[in-house]
């Protein structure tokens, strides 16, 4: 394959500078002329004798071009009536040089072992004798495309290595030469390329074609070898006009004939050489099958054509030496050796879909493979190099970062690194052994060669890297030592064998000495030998071992003198043995100077054996040693790493390992000692801190299955080594290890919501393990055979397992003590092997699929009932095949598609409709062996398949995909593949676990293949369907029984909310790093408390027929940035509240609500024409990228939906001409993207080197924009060339004299000025033309988060809440005259209630609207010096909403300590009571019977235990009392308003007089659990048998409800009933219990309704008269809030999943509503039941109940 610098193609003439004639040669008549056809310069070579007139590359025959591209493209034209010759010298893999010649001089094909001669005829006349001869008079320019790999493979049975030289001989014109690994099609246009799976010729290589003409009418394309199958024994006869180019194949051998095509070809693909069967006469017997056949026939089965063209088949596998496939590296290719089974991707398949590559190897979990002795320090001691099966890993020990060397297709058996970290040598284990030399710094493979040894066991570099020695076995099993010269490899040369030697002595270790590169040492059974390379001969001499001659030596190491003396006399050799001996050998005298033996001796009571250095008896088996100038590190089979002084007087340090130590290596600085164990552990001991650091752990046998847990980012693997291991995906470190000595684990899966995983074993047992306690929780043994499949539903309520005996088990996992529900025999195919894809659950949890009851059938069942819904006979799918097909693995696609994918034994993946069983499409030729695992991404874009030792990725979304991308790296078959929960990574497991990054961004407007058209929504819905919603969870067709199918829902959410599993990126949810930066830099999303099931199954219905309609939104997202826009000229005013864009008429107060975002909106931008509004939200759990919605302002419809960044969008801005939209990612994403507003396609994107806090277009020049960040201003210049836009960057640092710190805001002033705000409160002024800061002044004490300029005035807003107006008209003059802050003065100042985050002003900056972090929007008038509240909301969580008796007002309380009274009609703030430094936790409004309206009062409970009474009419606090020692949780008035009941978090209920402030009764019945609800009503039911005027209840967090009858005027209180509900052991609501809520039924005084964290998610209806539960209403989740409508039989329930459910208790139906961005913790009907208030954190939504 072509090296990276030769990819995708190489211009040979340009690279070797032919015009200079320094690296090339010319002879005879060679000149540069201008060709009229090509309209450019070409080289003319002419002369009567071809051999005397030529161009040769390279100049000298002793040099080599070293071009490894598979295809050579020769662009030439023969001179009329002349002969021409083209000679190519090609080197094979075994370094044999073969000349390949093409000429019209040759009359027939000739072949020798070193020369191939092909006749090339460019005109065909009728007589055969005229076929060979002179070029025609009208010879045309020709593209000669030679497949050098096929030429050598077919005709000489050799494997192509590289192109060594080229000679172009007279007479011809030549334009250029190119090499490439890609098969280009020269005559394909752009339109044809879009429809055909071919790669067009690059523009640089293409011939010019005038408009309206055909390429084939002007030029000739010759492809050799061709796709032709048969070649006649005589020359081909053609009579064609215009002339054809014909390459004549060999006469006597009917091998494939080269074909030249000068007519359009319907399907032009890569050349395919097909070797006919050996039985055919005249076939080349020695030619192996070079390439498998590729069929691009248009014939398709009816099933494949049902829904569009099928996938093009991939060719079968073959035993190849070279193949063009993807590796794990980003876009690189590798040359695999001949014994590797690797897929031969059809040329062009690498270009099949973009990005290419779509996967990039990020991390590897594993160590060793062939052995665990290969682990090295880099010379600088910063990294460790070790093999992980076929991958070489370089691990930075301080950061844990990995990089990889990829290309080996079998386990790496030996490694060596030179002393300068320049060259890395590696060898792979499978015979015959292939070796590679790598550039260690770049990771590029410099050389690949076959070792003379059959198996390489050890490698050693000289310190300079010029000599490499290897030890191994030849094919007879004899020990062999080889020395290679590697000095010329880095200069383009090759590895040279310097010497070879066979020896009968055993060699276990071999080292080149550091003091002399010609000397080496080896040790083995009974021998220690010193070697020398001299005169091309390796000779060795034994060391006299004396009495130690029978020892089994295992390792050796040289000790360098402390003074660094390089003399041999200064070096000593240490050798260790399996008997515990360590010999110190003088290399100069070749004698043993000291012999020591390490023996274990046990002291009384000692925990470990002590060591003594010399004695008799059994010693400690030493496997490895390493020596530094000060100490010797010894690794032994008893699991200890010991550090000794060089005199071995005593142990300095020791570290015990979990297994025998197999290798030790002291770092170059001597401070760290690397150790590896045979149990797969790799780590190092820090000698200074005496701390052992684990670097890598590994399974010691192939991994069978894996599973991922989303919340903690953990991975579980099971292996043939009988262990179950839990890994941290972020660090790739092992967290837990569960081992079973008798029972082998087979399958594993995580519980979706709890810290638990399930594992199936070979005995048939299924066990659950706790990740918190690291122990087995429950075990079930309902299977008789080994467990073959294990999977759970997405909600975690059900678990399924299958076994090798064919049984299927269903478990209930609603509680930790999970139990068996059903066991069905003979369901699953009994002889199916264990596979991660043996069982599959649909992503909505409703369907279960598996292979069974026979191999030929796939069964689909209802997951809850196990009712059989579908059975598909796979064996009857392919009627054209005589072989009975069988199913191997199954997986479901996204719920929206309804696809079920089945891999079969006939190398296909069949896509079925999961409901009807209809064949939707088919992917043929996936892999010749069974596929054990396959999975489809959440957005249905990529299909991942385990294909032998490779991973294949298909573009599933494209019906006519040309083929997959193939990735190597595994040395054993891949057992499992899976996408990570966020879809941004892929895991593959086999010999090791590989973690791959998915490089493809989420496509914004991509729809599911075959997905049904979107349902039309209500008035608030736009024409664009939410791609993110379709990419994850689609609305359920049914809600849980007994509710009917959910009718269409209201327009509060114009699209299905993308809550998905509710996981959110909360990295920015904490407090900002510094106070002033909170309002200056980034959008900080509100703390999200949504559960992982957020909005799953909700569907936004239209307004018609809905039960609720969103009327108003109370609040403003003060944590956004620039999330308010106002245009005074049009009156357009919009701001954000949670996920909603609120468009409000400032005159009437009427609101429109634009919905569809799946997360909280961070920022807004209005186009300069005021016709388009862009809104951006953060990333939700269902979308890997954030959303930007583009709205039509006039219609309120979403016109475009794009997904620009993987993190939150920090800023948006339209260009002055509204042709571009710039988006800026936050400090994690740091991406700047430009979008064309015509189609909103991505125009340009760049990764920023550091966090940026703001971006703005130059209003005077649409081609310039500016970013500000950490101490720099970045100017971007936009250069447009056609449709492409490139960015030129210029960075200017902030002058040190300014001392501004971080730049946090910016705005353009009068040309050419730019104003920048800083985190320290300064404003800097820049000259954008000169790129310098010429003025700064201190504008505030806090960070400047906002700047606006118009005319000659500048507005600044800071984190201190100050809004200041500056006169800056004189600043332009200061640019030339010099700076002076005295020329800038402040005109006005206003202090607002929070940090300024958004602002819009009119052109004169006289009035504007300003938003603050307090959730307030202010109208500011500079002329009047006033600020007026426009929008006011709570800045923190709203705890309660209550209503006045006449329903004219409502009141809210919040954790910010405020009680606010609102006018209900306009939702304008009327009164606010504020208590500093306290949280107001509960609130109650006095009932209507307490007196006249002017005597209405509010009772508010606070966190300090106080209860305050406020007078609404007098707007004053009347009374403060302290009835509780701890925080109040709920408060209520009695029906007459003369008594207040309050509950606290300790479970006490206090009864107080609001007039006197006395507490006259305290009830402690609920003590120990917080009181969550107190509900008071008039006692209407006389059947209760108790006295009293009031009936009230108290509910506490321990699932208990007490019901009381009271008459407080008589001081009477009597218990009516006591209810206790079962308490679950754990909960599904984020680790804390949902509240226990109860309320009296307003339409039936005898009924009580209760919700809480019970065993089941339901509403319990209890009859107080009958003393029993009369009804239960199921819920999808645990309730967080509850409210009953006084006027109708409606029940409102809020959930932590950001969802609201309205239940009609009379009809038994329900509707779900979305719109909140957080848990709906509060819902309250107004007394008239006409309105419903819901609250999520600090946002309040007001809903109208139509029909009342």
Curated annotation (Swiss-Prot):
Keywords tagged on the record: Cilium biogenesis/degradation, Cytoplasm, Cytoskeleton, Microtubule, Phosphoprotein, Repeat, WD repeat
GO molecular function: microtubule binding
Subcellular location: Cytoplasm, Cytoskeleton, Microtubule organizing center, Centrosome, Centriole; Cytoplasm, Cytoskeleton, Microtubule organizing center, Centrosome, Centriolar satellite
Pfam families per record: Beta-prop_WDR90_POC16_2nd, CFA20_dom, WD40, WDR90_beta-prop_4th
PANTHER family: WD REPEAT-CONTAINING PROTEIN 90, WD-40 REPEAT PROTEIN
Homology family: Belongs to the WD repeat WDR90/POC16 family.
Name under which the protein is recorded: WD repeat-containing protein 90
Native organism: Homo sapiens (Human)
């Amino acid at each position: 394959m072509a090296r990276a610098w030769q990819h995708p193609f190489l211009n040979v003439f340009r690279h070797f500078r032919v015009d200079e004639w320094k690296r090339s040669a010319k002879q005879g008549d060679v000149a540069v002329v201008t060709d009229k056809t090509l309209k450019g310069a070409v080289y003319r070579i002419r002369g009567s004798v071809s051999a005397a007139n030529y161009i040769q590359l390279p100049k000298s025959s002793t040099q080599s071009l070293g071009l490894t591209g598979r295809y050579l493209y020769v662009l030439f034209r023969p001179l009329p009536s002349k002969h021409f010759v083209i000679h190519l010298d090609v080197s094979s893999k075994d370094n044999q040089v073969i000349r390949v010649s093409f000429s019209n001089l040759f009359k027939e094909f000739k072949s020798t072992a070193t020369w191939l001669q092909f006749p090339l005829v460019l005109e065909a006349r009728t007589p055969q004798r005229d076929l060979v001869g002179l070029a025609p008079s009208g010879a045309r320019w020709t593209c000669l495309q030679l497949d050098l790999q096929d030429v050598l493979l077919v005709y000489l049975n050799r494997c192509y290595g590289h192109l060594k030289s080229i000679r172009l001989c007279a007479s011809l014109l030549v334009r250029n030469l190119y090499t490439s690994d890609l098969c280009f099609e020269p005559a394909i246009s752009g339109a044809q390329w879009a429809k055909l799976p071919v790669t067009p010729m690059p523009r640089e290589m293409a011939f010019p074609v005038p408009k309206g003409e055909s390429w084939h009418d002007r030029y000739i394309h010759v492809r050799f070898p061709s796709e032709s199958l048969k070649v006649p024994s005589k020359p081909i006869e053609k009579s064609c006009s215009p002339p054809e180019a014909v390459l004549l194949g060999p006469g006597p051998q009917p091998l494939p004939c080269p074909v030249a095509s000068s007519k359009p070809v319907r399907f032009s693909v890569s050349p395919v050489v097909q070797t006919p069967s050996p039985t055919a006469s005249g076939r080349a017997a020695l030619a192996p099958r070079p390439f498998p056949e590729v069929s691009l026939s248009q014939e398709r089965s009816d099933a494949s054509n049902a829904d569009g063209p099928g996938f093009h088949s991939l060719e079968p596998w073959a035993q190849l030496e070279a193949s063009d496939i993807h590796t794990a590296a980003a876009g690189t290719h590798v040359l695999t050796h001949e014994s590797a089974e690797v897929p031969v991707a059809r040329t062009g398949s690498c270009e099949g879909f973009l990005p290419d590559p779509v996967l990039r190897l990020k991390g590897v979990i594993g160590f060793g493979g062939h052995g665990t002795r290969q682990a090295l320090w880099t010379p600088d001691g910063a990294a460790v190099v070790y093999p992980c099966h076929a991958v070489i890993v370089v691990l930075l020990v301080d950061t844990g970062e990995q990089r990889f060397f990829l290309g080996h297709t079998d386990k790496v058996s030996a490694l060596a690194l030179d002393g300068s970290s320049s060259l890395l040598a590696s060898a792979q284990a499978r015979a015959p052994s292939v070796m590679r030399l790598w550039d260690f710094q770049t990771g590029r493979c410099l050389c690949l060669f076959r070792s003379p040894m059959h198996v390489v066991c050890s490698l050693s570099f000289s310190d300079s890297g010029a000599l490499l020695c290897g030890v191994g076995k030849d094919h007879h099993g004899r020990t062999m030592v080889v020395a290679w010269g590697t000095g010329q490899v880095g200069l383009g040369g090759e590895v040279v064998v310097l010497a070879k030697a066979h020896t009968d002595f055993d060699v276990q270790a071999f080292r080149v000495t550091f003091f002399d590169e010609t000397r080496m040492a080896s040790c083995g059974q009974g021998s220690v030998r010193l070697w020398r390379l001299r005169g091309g001969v390796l000779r060795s001499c034994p060391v006299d071992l004396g009495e130690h001659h029978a020892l089994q030596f295992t390792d050796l190491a040289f000790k360098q003198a402390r003074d660094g003396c390089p003399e041999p006399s200064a070096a000593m050799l240490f050798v260790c043995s399996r008997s515990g001996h360590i010999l110190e050998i003088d290399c100069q005298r070749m004698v043993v100077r000291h012999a020591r033996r390490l023996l274990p001796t046990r002291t009384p009571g000692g925990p470990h054996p002590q060591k003594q250095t010399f004695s008799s008896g059994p010693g400690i088996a030493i496997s490895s040693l390493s020596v530094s100038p000060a100490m010797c590190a010894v690794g032994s089979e008893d699991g200890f790493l010991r550090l000794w002084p060089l005199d071995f007087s005593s142990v300095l340090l020791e570290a015990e390992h979990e297994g025998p130590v197999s290798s030790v290596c002291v770092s170059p600085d001597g401070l760290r000692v690397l150790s590896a164990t045979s149990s797969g552990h790799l780590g190092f001991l820090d000698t200074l801190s005496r701390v052992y650091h684990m670097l890598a752990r590994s399974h010691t046998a192939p991994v069978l299955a894996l599973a991922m847990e989303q919340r903690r980012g953990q991975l579980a693997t099971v292996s043939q080594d009988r262990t179950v291991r839990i890994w941290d995906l972020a660090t790739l470190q092992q967290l837990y290890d569960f081992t079973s000595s008798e029972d082998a684990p087979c399958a594993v899966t995580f519980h979706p919501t709890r810290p638990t995983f399930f594992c199936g074993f070979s005995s048939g047992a299924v066990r659950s393990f706790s990740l918190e306690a690291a122990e087995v929780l429950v075990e079930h043994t309902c299977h008789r055979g080994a467990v073959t499949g294990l999977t759970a539903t997405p909600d975690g309520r059900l678990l399924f397992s299958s076994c090798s005996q064919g049984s299927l088990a269903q478990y209930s996992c609603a509680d930790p003590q999970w139990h068996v529900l059903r066991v069905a025999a003979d369901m699953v195919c009994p002889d199916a092997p264990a596979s991660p894809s043996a069982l599959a659950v649909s992503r909505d949890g409703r369907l279960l699929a598996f292979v069974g009851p026979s191999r030929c059938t796939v069964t689909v069942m209802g997951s809850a009932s196990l009712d059989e819904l579908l059975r598909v006979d796979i064996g009857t799918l392919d009627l054209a095949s005589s072989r009975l097909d069988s199913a191997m693995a199954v997986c479901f696609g996204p719920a929206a598609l309804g696809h079920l994918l089945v891999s079969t034994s006939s190398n296909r993946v069949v896509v079925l409709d999961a409901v009807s069983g209809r064949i939707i499409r088919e992917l043929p030729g996936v892999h010749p062996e069974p596929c054990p695992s396959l999975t489809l991404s959440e957005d249905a874009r990529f299909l991942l398949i385990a294909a032998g030792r490779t991973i294949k990725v298909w573009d599933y979304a494209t019906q006519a995909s040309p083929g997959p991308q193939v990735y190597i790296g595994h040395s054993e078959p891949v057992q499992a593949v899976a996408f990570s929960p966020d879809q941004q990574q892929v895991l593959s497991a086999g010999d090791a676990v590989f973690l791959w990054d998915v490089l493809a961004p989420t496509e914004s407007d991509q729809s599911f293949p075959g997905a049904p058209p979107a349902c039309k929504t209500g008035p608030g819905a736009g024409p664009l369907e939410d791609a993110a919603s379709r990419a994850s969870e689609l609305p359920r067709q049914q809600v849980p029984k007994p509710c009917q199918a959910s009718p269409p829902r209201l327009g509060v959410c114009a699209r299905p909310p993308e809550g998905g599993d509710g996981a959110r990126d909360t990295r920015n949810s904490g407090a900002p790093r510094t106070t002033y930066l909170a309002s200056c830099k980034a959008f900080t999303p509100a703390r999200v408390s949504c559960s992982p099931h957020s909005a799953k199954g909700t569907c936004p219905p239209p307004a018609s027929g809905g039960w609720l309609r969103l009327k108003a939104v109370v609040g403003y997202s003060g944590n956004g940035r620039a999330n308010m826009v106002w245009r005074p000229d049009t009156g357009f005013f919009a701001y954000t509240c949670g996920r909603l864009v609120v468009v409000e008429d400032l005159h009437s107060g009427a609101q429109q609500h634009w919905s569809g975002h799946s997360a909280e909106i961070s920022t807004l931008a209005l186009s300069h024409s005021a016709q388009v509004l862009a809104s951006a939200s953060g990333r939700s759990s269902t979308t890997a990228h954030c959303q930007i919605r583009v709205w039509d302002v006039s219609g309120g419809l979403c016109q475009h939906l794009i997904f620009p960044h993987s993190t939150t969008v920090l800023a948006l801005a339209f260009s002055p001409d509204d042709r571009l939209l710039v988006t800026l990612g936050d400090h994690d994403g740091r991406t700047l993207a430009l979008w064309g507003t015509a189609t909103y396609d991505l125009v340009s994107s760049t990764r920023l080197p550091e966090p940026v806090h703001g971006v703005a277009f130059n209003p005077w020049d649409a081609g310039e924009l500016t970013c500000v960040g950490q101490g720099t201003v970045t100017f971007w210049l936009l250069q447009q060339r056609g449709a492409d836009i490139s960015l030129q960057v210029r960075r200017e640092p902030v002058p040190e004299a300014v001392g501004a710190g971080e730049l946090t805001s910016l705005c353009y002033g009068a040309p050419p000025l730019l104003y920048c705000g800083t985190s320290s409160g300064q404003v800097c002024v820049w000259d954008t033309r000169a790129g310098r800061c010429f003025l700064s002044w201190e504008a505030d004490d806090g960070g400047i988060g906002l700047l606006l300029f118009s005319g000659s005035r500048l507005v600044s807003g800071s984190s201190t809440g100050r809004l200041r107006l500056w006169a800056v008209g004189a600043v332009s003059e200061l640019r030339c005259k010099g700076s002076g802050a005295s020329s800038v003065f402040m005109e006005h100042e206003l202090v607002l209630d929070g940090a300024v985050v958004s602002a819009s002003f009119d052109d004169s900056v006289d009035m504007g609207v300003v938003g603050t972090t307090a959730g307030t929007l202010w109208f500011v008038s500079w002329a009047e010096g006033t600020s007026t509240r426009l929008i006011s909301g709570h800045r923190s969580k709203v705890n309660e909403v209550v209503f006045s008796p006449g329903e004219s007002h409502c009141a809210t309380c919040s954790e910010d300590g405020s009680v606010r009274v609102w006018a209900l009609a306009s939702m304008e703030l009327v009164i606010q009571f504020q208590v500093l430094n306290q949280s107001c936790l509960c609130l109650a409004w006095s009932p209507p019977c307490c007196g006249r309206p002017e005597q209405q009062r509010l009772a508010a409970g606070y966190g300090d235990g106080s209860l305050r009474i406020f007078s609404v009419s007098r707007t004053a606090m009347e009374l403060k009392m302290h009835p509780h020692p701890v925080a109040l949780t709920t408060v209520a008035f009695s029906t007459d308003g003369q008594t207040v009941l309050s509950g606290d978090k300790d479970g006490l209920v206090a009864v107080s007089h609001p007039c006197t402030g006395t507490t006259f009764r305290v009830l402690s019945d609920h003590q120990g659990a917080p009181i969550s609800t107190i509900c008071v009503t008039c006692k209407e039911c006389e059947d209760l048998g108790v006295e009293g005027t009031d009936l009230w209840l108290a509910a506490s967090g321990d699932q208990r409800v007490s019901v009381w009858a009271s008459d407080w005027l008589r001081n009477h209180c009597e218990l009516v009933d006591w209810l206790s509900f079962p308490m679950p052991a754990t909960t599904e609501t984020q680790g804390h219990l949902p509240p226990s809520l109860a309320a009296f039924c307003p339409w039936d005084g005898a009924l009580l309704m209760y919700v809480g964290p019970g065993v089941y998610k339901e509403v319990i209806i209890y009859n107080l008269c009958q003393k029993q539960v009369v009804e239960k209403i199921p819920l999808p989740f645990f309730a967080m809030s509850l409210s009953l409508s006084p006027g109708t039989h409606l029940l409102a329930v809020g959930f932590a999943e950001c969802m609201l459910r309205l239940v009609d208790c009379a009809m038994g139906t329900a509707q779900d509503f979305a719109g909140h961005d957080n848990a709906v913790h509060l819902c309250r009907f107004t007394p008239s039941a006409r309105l419903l208030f819901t609250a999520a954190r600090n946002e309040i939504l007001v809903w109208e109940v139509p029909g009342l």
